[in-house]
């Protein structure tokens, strides 16, 4: 091999005539002498400008760094024979060459060195200064130990990593590198390494997971040796569309002629393509024939994995007003944020004389209007006072429905005169009174509730059956009701009836009434448990809802796990129906549709889990207990202020730590429910104590992909578990995504029987009730898959949680 100015010549592989390249064991090389190297030195932040020219001006040239073609980006630009790099960093150090296009001929070579300080060429210059200060012999020592404190380095795959061990000594020490305790050289790694001895550094480009390990620099001279070990962790890139920082860019209103800036922060593992767009009109229309809006591209560029992009508009005019879009896309998908720019045009100033005249007139008008209003108010007060005295004598108390068996000490049921048949307003309003102790309601038989003809069912048409389950304050029984089905009024229908227990309090009564009224307002949907009727007159309160014969989704899935495993309920019993992968996707899709409907009704569930989804005889998923949620109307969050029982393992971090509930926190819970579905009723975070769970969630840990789950569905789960609530998908988006997955899924794709589900199941079950309302109830039985308040007698044939 030939060297030019101490630099090895280029090696070019040559294929001999008539020879198959693939058949050779090792390539032959043709030695090509390179032109001399121009050595140039720059300081971090400066601009590099290099040039070369071919003999023929029409010949195209290209630029390479360390033998690899240079791709223009936001810092690097190339033109015919010119290379420009702005804001250089130490990573820009290397060998640059100018070559003829489609040729191996090199026109010019440059050795570029980028240093930290203008006064020194490299780290070794500082070391020489240290050596000049003393004539004593000394062992090696670190010159910049503060830059070596970070010993654990984690980077995404395909990034460039550099380890540095700047040192000094007399005589000047040498440096070599070890990986996992063994000598490390370029041939040990695909892609090779770069050893920059003058900078005491090791550089690896485009790292991959196999590059993980411990890297040790050994610095030594004849008087001693020192070493430093770095741990490298290479993270797999996640397949995720770009993420835009919430709240950016925001709407702005500026004065005509001023300047304005919009910021858009983009996060993406894959390099994103970022565009700034403005909505425009074409021939008076904002939309094209295909329904897509017309837009003009203001800016467009490709950048790194974390980008803070800015759109600057100078001296804005009325034509700048309108809707804008920041759009980012990678090979996974697209994310965009719309915002508006409004232009304020100040009115021209009025002449001084006219302004004074207008001001005087305004004061006069104001005085006259104020006097008139005061006079009218005085007249109204006098008339009201005169009418009030006789009205007291003639007033008679209207008839009031009274609670005949017990007083409501803490809360009172107040009556409305209008029916709820044609109104979304609750018929029964709960008002809080000042008294307090949660009195027990023994032997409840009559309530002073108003008659609602739309929902009322005569007790004579209802036949109660066997109990289905009971909770902390209520119970559910199966029943036969006549007249529920309007098309077949004389045919009995099977329903579930919610009622209070004997030891229920007035608070429990209030909750059941509120749940009934909430179900009235929310309306009907195929994928929620619908209200069928109520018995409110001449006896205890009965709330009739749809009956789901196959019980909760969690028990439904567990009962249909593949046979022959230790986790089966009965090892000798084969499930009546075997689930396919499409069945599981269908379950997820139906629950998403139900939650999409509840979200459209401004209803936050707060306790979405497989145990609160019921399954009908036709395998229809129905969300239950949403009536216990809060109607948020104009406020998109509900902040819990009491220390009630909380389903910890299903709760979003903002709900867990800040007690803030939104539709976004319901989406997090839906992600956990997805995990339950694809583990066939597994317990989330198996084996992890609650205290440890808090810590793991804060650190960003998430559950692993279930065995019977595709990568696409797992990425949907991970999107539901995004740390930023506003970045989680809406239920509408989840419905669209799952509908697409459902469409392309085969109906014959059965589950993998080799997967053991015991890893997702708790080690034991406990059937007793844990209805404590104390602060510690959240942690009392974390090994159970359900929240701490469990039903006492859970059946599998249609029990509806209360």
From Swiss-Prot:
What positions constitute the catalytic site?
607 (proton acceptor)
User: Which cysteine pairs are covalently linked by disulfides here?
Assistant: 52-98, 165-217, 264-326
Q: Which GO terms describe its molecular function?
A: ATP binding; fibroblast growth factor binding; fibroblast growth factor receptor activity
- SUPFAM superfamilies recorded: Immunoglobulin (SSF48726), Protein kinase-like (PK-like) (SSF56112)
What's the catalysed reaction?
Answer: L-tyrosyl-[protein] + ATP = O-phospho-L-tyrosyl-[protein] + ADP + H(+)
Reported modifications of this chain: Autophosphorylated. Binding of FGF family members together with heparan sulfate proteoglycan or heparin promotes receptor dimerization and autophosphorylation on tyrosine residues. Autophosphorylation occurs in trans between the two FGFR molecules present in the dimer.
Location in the cell: Cell membrane
Q: How does it sit in the membrane?
A: Single-pass type I membrane protein
Q: Is the keyword Ubl conjugation assigned to this protein?
A: no
Q: Which GO terms describe its biological process?
A: apoptotic process; fibroblast growth factor receptor signaling pathway; positive regulation of cell population proliferation; positive regulation of MAPK cascade
- Which residue windows does the record flag with biased composition (Acidic residues)? 121-136
Give the comment on domains: The second and third Ig-like domains directly interact with fibroblast growth factors (FGF) and heparan sulfate proteoglycans.
Q: Which family does it belong to?
A: Belongs to the protein kinase superfamily. Tyr protein kinase family. Fibroblast growth factor receptor subfamily.
Q: What does this protein do?
A: Tyrosine-protein kinase that acts as a cell-surface receptor for fibroblast growth factors and plays an essential role in the regulation of cell proliferation, differentiation and apoptosis. Plays an essential role in the regulation of chondrocyte differentiation, proliferation and apoptosis, and is required for normal skeleton development. Regulates both osteogenesis and postnatal bone mineralization by osteoblasts. Promotes apoptosis in chondrocytes, but can also promote cancer cell proliferation. Phosphorylates PLCG1, CBL and FRS2.
Under what name is this protein listed?
Answer: Fibroblast growth factor receptor 3
What is the organism field in this record?
Answer: Xenopus laevis (African clawed frog)
Q: Which gene encodes it?
A: fgfr3
């Amino acid at each position: 091999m030939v060297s030019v100015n101490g630099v090895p010549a280029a090696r070019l592989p040559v294929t001999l005539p008539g020879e198959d390249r693939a058949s050779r064991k090792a390539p032959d090389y043709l030695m090509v002498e390179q032109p001399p190297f121009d050595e140039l030195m720059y300081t971090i932040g400066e601009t590099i400008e290099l040039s070369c020219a071919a003999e023929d001006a029409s010949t195209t040239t290209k630029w390479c760094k360390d033998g690899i073609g240079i791709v223009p980006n936001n810092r690097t630009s190339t033109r015919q024979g010119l290379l420009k790099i702005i804001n250089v960093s130490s990573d820009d150090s290397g060998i640059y060459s100018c070559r003829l296009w489609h040729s191996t001929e090199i026109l010019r070579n440059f050795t570029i060195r980028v240093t930290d300080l203008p006064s020194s060429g490299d780290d070794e210059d500082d070391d020489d200064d240290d050596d000049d200060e003393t004539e004593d012999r000394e062992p090696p020592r670190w010159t910049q130990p503060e830059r070596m404190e970070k010993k654990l380095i984690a980077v995404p795959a395909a990034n460039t990593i550099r380890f540095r061990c700047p040192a000094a000594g007399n005589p000047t020490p040498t440096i070599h590198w070890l990986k996992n305790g063994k000598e490390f050289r370029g041939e040990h790694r695909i892609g090779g390494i770069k050893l920059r001895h003058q900078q005491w550094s090791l550089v690896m480009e485009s790292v991959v997971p196999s590059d993980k390990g411990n890297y040790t620099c050994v610095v030594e001279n004849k008087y001693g040796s020192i070493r430093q070990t770095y741990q490298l962790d290479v993270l797999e890139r996640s397949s995720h569309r770009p993420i835009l920082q919430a709240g950016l860019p925001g709407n702005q209103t500026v004065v005509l002629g001023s300047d304005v800036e919009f910021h858009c922060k983009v996060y993406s593992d894959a390099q994103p393509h970022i565009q700034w767009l403005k909505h425009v009109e074409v021939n008076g229309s904002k939309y094209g024939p295909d329904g897509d809006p017309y837009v003009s591209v203001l800016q467009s560029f490709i950048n790194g994995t974390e980008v803070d992009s800015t759109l600057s508009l100078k001296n804005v005019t009325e034509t700048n007003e309108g809707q804008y879009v920041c759009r980012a896309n990678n090979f996974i998908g697209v994310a965009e944020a719309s915002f508006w720019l409004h232009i304020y045009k100040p009115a021209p100033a009025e002449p001084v004389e006219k302004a004074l005249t207008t001001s005087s007139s305004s004061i006069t008008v104001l005085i006259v209007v104020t006097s008139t209003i005061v006079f009218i108010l005085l007249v109204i007060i006098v008339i009201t006072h005169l009418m009030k005295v006789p009205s007291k004598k003639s007033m008679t108390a209207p008839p009031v429905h009274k609670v005949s068996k017990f007083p409501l000490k803490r809360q009172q049921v107040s009556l409305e005169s209008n029916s709820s048949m044609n109104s979304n307003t609750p018929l029964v309003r709960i008002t809080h009174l000042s008294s307090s102790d949660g009195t027990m309601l023994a032997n409840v038989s009559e309530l002073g509730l108003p008659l609602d003809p739309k929902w009322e069912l005569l007790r004579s048409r209802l036949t109660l059956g066997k109990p289905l389950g009971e909770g902390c304050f209520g119970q559910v029984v199966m029943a036969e009701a006549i007249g529920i089905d309007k098309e077949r009024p004389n045919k009995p229908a099977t329903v579930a009836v919610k009622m209070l227990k004997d030891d229920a309090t007035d608070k429990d009564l209030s909750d059941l009434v509120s749940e009934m009224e909430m179900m009235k307002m929310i309306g009907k949907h195929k994928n929620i448990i619908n209200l069928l009727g109520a018995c409110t007159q001449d006896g205890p309160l009965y709330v009739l809802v749809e009956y789901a014969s196959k019980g909760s989704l969690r028990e439904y899935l567990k009962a249909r796990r593949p046979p022959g495993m230790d986790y089966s309920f009965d090892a000798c019993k084969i499930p009546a129906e075997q689930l396919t992968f499409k069945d599981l996707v269908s379950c997820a899709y139906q629950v998403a549709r139900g939650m999409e409907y509840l979200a459209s009704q401004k209803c936050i569930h707060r306790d979405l889990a497989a145990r609160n989804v019921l399954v009908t005889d036709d395998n229809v998923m129905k969300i239950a207990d949403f009536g216990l949620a809060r109607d948020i109307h104009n406020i998109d969050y509900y902040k819990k202020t009491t220390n009630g029982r909380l389903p910890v393992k299903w709760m979003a971090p903002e709900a867990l730590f800040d007690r803030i509930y939104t539709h976004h926190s319901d989406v997090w819970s839906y992600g956990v429910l997805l995990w339950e579905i694809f583990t066939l009723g597994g317990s989330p975070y198996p084996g992890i104590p609650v205290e440890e769970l808090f810590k793991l969630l804060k650190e960003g840990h998430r559950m692993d992909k279930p065995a019977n789950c595709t990568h696409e569905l797992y990425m949907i789960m991970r999107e539901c578990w995004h740390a930023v609530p506003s970045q989680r998908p809406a239920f509408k988006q989840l419905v669209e995504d799952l509908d697409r997955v459902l469409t392309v899924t085969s109906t014959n794709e059965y589950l993998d029987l080799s997967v053991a589900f015991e890893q997702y199941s708790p080690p034991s079950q406990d059937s007793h009730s844990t209805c404590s309302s104390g602060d510690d109830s959240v942690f009392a039985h974390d090994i159970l898959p359900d929240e701490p308040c469990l039903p006492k007698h859970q059946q599998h044939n249609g029990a509806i949680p209360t």
